């Protein structure tokens, strides 16, 4: 049976040692770095052609996961609106957040965390809903969303690209993502799946956005045209190496490793823009590539922390393919390799994000 | 520290033997019996003074819990709209469900169940959100809801009534709810807390309803003026008797039993109507008392099934007060007493519901 991404792509649940709640510090750094862009997009909702000021601002967070990240994004939106309304002297609208993720996401933990935001913004009238479902399909009613926001989600594909020979044999043996040694068919398969999926994210959002609505999408991407550049392949190469070690130890089947590819893609800014133009529902108001230094003296200076950062989002999918029982061994081995790479300065040192702000084209209003 | 109802009132989680998902069959019967009333209220949304037909129908289910009950309520709403639109020859609107319960509710299990409805209504454009929070406060933006529905939730109080003597001593010793032997202060305390809480449910919903919006509230209530009539006190008297047995066995402290009262109230139709009139935001379009026969040859013919039905909603709150470790013993003892009562025909034989359909008064439109 084909792997159903919707059942296995989620962030580690709860708030334990390896949970996403505890370990997704990098996403928080990306949120902090891109805050001015989100703020500007939010505030542009108040300077458009609306005949009356918005009474309710509907905000969606696609693939929000759980923990401090969605809460931080909510705070940024609330503060941006408070600031803008202060500036314009207009009455504060009510704000309704729609926190979206696949139904396998730990919404119970997400909801319990909302009290933090409640404490922080007692004087603002805001509401939070959980919206379970895939952003590769419809999620919200027509013309309902003023701001659709997503940080580090839409680089997840709806399924792993099909990368086999005509005879059905795996073409990406010993690897789980694009790599320097992968044949061209692997890169082509990944790019093609990304184009299809990212295009569907845009197509399904288009009817859902209110006129003049904005989308801010932040994807984990890459800087160069080369889809196998070290900074993006490093993580998956590292895990593939650790998996190969487990194969050599007889702990997992070689066939399981050879046939597996992660449903994830790091696009370049140019690839993102090309899909947006081709899909046609949105105008690009802003587009940029944002670089964060990692490793060394920066974030993730410690291999242990970095492995936790990798584990909290890759474990559910790896555990589904290779078994829960080998996960500790897998990440221990990966940490060992990473520590050695740190000594030799071989680890990836950059985290790349592609950020776009999109506006719904006016002729796209659905009735 | 005062007991916080929002942390302890929830239905048993998951889908195990004592779960609400498996054991809340009585609520399903209430939903089936009141279906024509809900249907009529939904369809009345399409025959009002709306200048244009609704494009999106926003529906809220207050205190929806989890399992088949909220899914069944969604089905009734969808089918009512499909039928009405067929009749009127109008285009189907999109439907957005807001499934509300306290943040302690098991939303993860609730969301996983949505696939059942998805399979059933593939050709209808509907969306479901989880809306965590207390219905004794604001939950949704202004003027947003067309239908607010609630089955067997708003009889839960925001807190247990304070029933002590002037010296602070408990007045409802050995009981956990109103009972034949309770002094008048107990009944007064309960009624007063219900009036305050039910009034706040109405007051907080009023700004949230769209013009011409409807509320359908179904409460577990009583038939007569006497708030200690057998059919409503039976459950809590039974549990109090089982708790007293555990006290006599030294398994729980007498003081814990004496000071405890459940935050629950079974109002009469007249009490419900009086609060609605006094609060003033809504016109009552329909009001009735609905009786279901239980026990004997009807639903819950078996004491074991009936105890599971009681346990799935009372366990979290009892377990918080008396400890998880005594729950099996408590419900075993209660089943023993119940079985004896069945033999002697002493058990409650009626389940009473109060049903009201309310329309937002036109001068209550909030801007």
UniProtKB/Swiss-Prot annotation, chains A, B:
This is Probable 7-methylxanthine methyltransferase 2. S-adenosyl-L-homocysteine binds at residues 20, 64, 69, 101-102, 134-135. GO terms for biological process: methylation. Mg(2+) binds at residues 172, 258, 260-261. PANTHER family: S-ADENOSYL-L-METHIONINE:CARBOXYL METHYLTRANSFERASE FAMILY PROTEIN (PTHR31009). One of its GO terms (molecular function) is metal ion binding. Theobromine binds at residues 27, 152, 155-156, 313. The record marks 149, 220, 264, 324 as: Involved in substrate discrimination. The keyword Methyltransferase applies. Involved in the biosynthesis of theobromine. It catalyses: 7-methylxanthine + S-adenosyl-L-methionine = theobromine + S-adenosyl-L-homocysteine + H(+). It is an enzyme of class 2 (transferase). Belongs to the methyltransferase superfamily. Type-7 methyltransferase family. Binds 1 Mg(2+) ion per subunit. Its EC number is 2.1.1.159. Pathway: Alkaloid biosynthesis. Its cofactor is Mg(2+). Keywords: Magnesium, Metal-binding, Methyltransferase, Transferase.
